[in-house]
Amino acid sequence: MKKVLLATALSLCVASAFAADTAVLQVKGKLTNAACTPQLSNGGVVDYGTIHLGELSATAVNQLGDKDINLTITCGAPTQVGWVVNDDRESSKAGINVDFNGTMQNISYYQYGVGKTIGGVNIGNYMLFIKNKKVTIDGQEGDEIFSNVDWNGSKWESGGAVRSDGISIISAATTGTTTPVAFTTAVFPLVTSLAIQGTDTLAITDDTSLDGQATITLKYL
């Protein structure tokens, strides 16, 4: 039955192909000098400083709070552009709850790893979001919006936490709308929220550095 249906479908396609004398092929694109550059404040480093193990819970997840870092995108001319994030330390995510705006979250694609102990234990994870879902667009306040890559730009929604798997494109819109706007400069006030495992699980005996790293990539719209 499947072969018959397939043959029928192919026959219909062939018949359709010869129903007209011509077909139109279009090749489209856009050449532009409006290249954009992303830049993070503080050299791209979010520093939680020295964390004393003796001040942490041995058995419960330790919420270490929020830190701010700005992402500024500058373009040579007004440009519609967004960005995605990929976690370079994905294998070190601990899968523990993170305090996201007062709500505990542990959805994997919203979490980023921060490295492992010498013993191979995943230290913890953090979340990344945009403060108050607001963006400064050419000096004016606007809104954070996002669109998943498999939506192919067909829809945009109000923003939230930033996915760590490169699936969601983050961009900027005029306040109260969800349509990307062209800009020359946009500032996205990023916030990290960090949690690490209890010290009994970490079993750290020597100084251990947090080693979170993520890559931000621009996407022209």
Range-by-range predicted roles:
Residues 1-20:
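Gram-negative bacterial Sec-dependent N-terminal signal peptides
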Residues 19-221:
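Mature extracellular/passenger domains of Gram-negative fimbrial/pilin and adhesin proteins
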